[in-house]
Swiss-Prot record:
Lineage: Eukaryota, Viridiplantae, Streptophyta, Embryophyta, Tracheophyta
Subcellular localization: Nucleus; Cytoplasm
Biased composition (Basic and acidic residues): 1-20
Protein name according to UniProt: Eukaryotic translation initiation factor 4E allele A
Top-level taxon: Eukaryota
Pfam families in the cross-refs: IF4E
Effect of G110R: No resistance to potyviruses (e.g. potato virus Y (PVY)). No resistance to potyviruses (e.g. potato virus Y (PVY))
GO terms of biological process kind: defense response to virus; regulation of translation; translational initiation
Recorded GO CC terms: cytoplasm; eukaryotic translation initiation factor 4F complex; nucleus
Purpose: Component of the protein complex eIF4F, which is involved in the recognition of the mRNA cap, ATP-dependent unwinding of 5'-terminal secondary structure and recruitment of mRNA to the ribosome. Recognizes and binds the 7-methylguanosine-containing mRNA cap during an early step in the initiation of protein synthesis and facilitates ribosome binding by inducing the unwinding of the mRNAs secondary structures. Key component of recessive resistance to potyviruses.
Post-translational modification: According to the redox status, the Cys-129-Cys-167 disulfide bridge may have a role in regulating protein function by affecting its ability to bind capped mRNA.
Similarity field: Belongs to the eukaryotic initiation factor 4E family.
Length: 231
């Protein structure tokens, strides 16, 4: 299924018409850093003044996390710079958050922006993530915005056949470009991981090969870790 078609056939059809409806339903960190949240647009502000009488619940609640390069430089332990930004559980609250958060092309260099199932932290040490791994895609600088959005829509819209295997996703902004990683919880389940990788490529109309690395390999071998699965 092409990415555009996938977007039309998910529950986000109606939601896109409501784009920034009611951002008040989630949990927000009130001390945000530069490069993390954008100011409300006039269109968004007009929606926030209206009461949304019907909201469309998602299969799971999700949390946005932000990791800035400034915070990373000050952290005393790996992962301590991660900030819980916003938790949402409905289509409308997702769009309310998404429209007030910098997209990858506007994030500061060295930043990481995560979207994970609520109560799962984007760390190897999290019990749910510990035995998992990641699929990764690379993009030229400033070219990952649409793919990041489609990844979020497919993930929170429960479009993957093995959606229960998915922990979350992260977009990372670096000097050479941007990367999107899809985190899963059971790396040894080859059938599930390969299915997720294939569907992810399909949703994004991504033609290049993508690889899957076990967290255990990444922890032991760092950048020398090899792909266990490729699609």
């Amino acid at each position: 299924m092409a990415a555009a078609e996938m977007e039309r056939t998910t529950s986000f059809d109606a939601a896109e018409k409501l784009k920034a409806a009611d951002a008040g339903g989630g949990e927000v960190d009130d001390e945000l850093e530069e490069g993390e949240i954008v100011e409300e647009s006039n269109d968004t502000a007009s929606y926030l003044g209206k009461e949304i009488t019907v909201k469309h619940p998602l299969e799971h609640s999700w949390t946005f996390w932000f990791d800035s390069p400034i915070a990373k430089s000050r952290q005393t332990a790996w992962g301590s710079s991660l900030r819980n930004v916003y938790t949402f559980s409905t289509v409308e609250d997702f769009w309310g958050a998404y429209n007030n958060i910098h997209h990858p092309s506007k994030l500061v260099m060295g930043a990481d922006f995560h979207c994970f199932k609520h109560k799962i932290e984007p760390k190897w040490e999290d019990p749910v993530c510990a035995n998992g791994g990641t699929w990764k895609m690379s993009f030229l600088k400033g070219k990952s915005d649409t793919s990041w959005l489609y990844t979020l829509l497919a993930m929170i819209g429960h479009q993957f056949d093995h959606g229960d295997e998915i922990c979350g996703a992260v977009v990372s902004v670096r000097s050479k470009g941007e990367k999107i990683a899809l985190w899963t919880k059971n790396a040894a389940n080859e059938t599930a991981q390969v299915s997720i990788g294939k569907q992810w490529k399909q949703f994004l109309d991504h033609s290049d090969s993508v690889g899957f690395i076990f967290h255990d390999d990444a922890k032991r071998l760092d950048r020398s870790a090899k792909n266990r699965y490729t699609v």
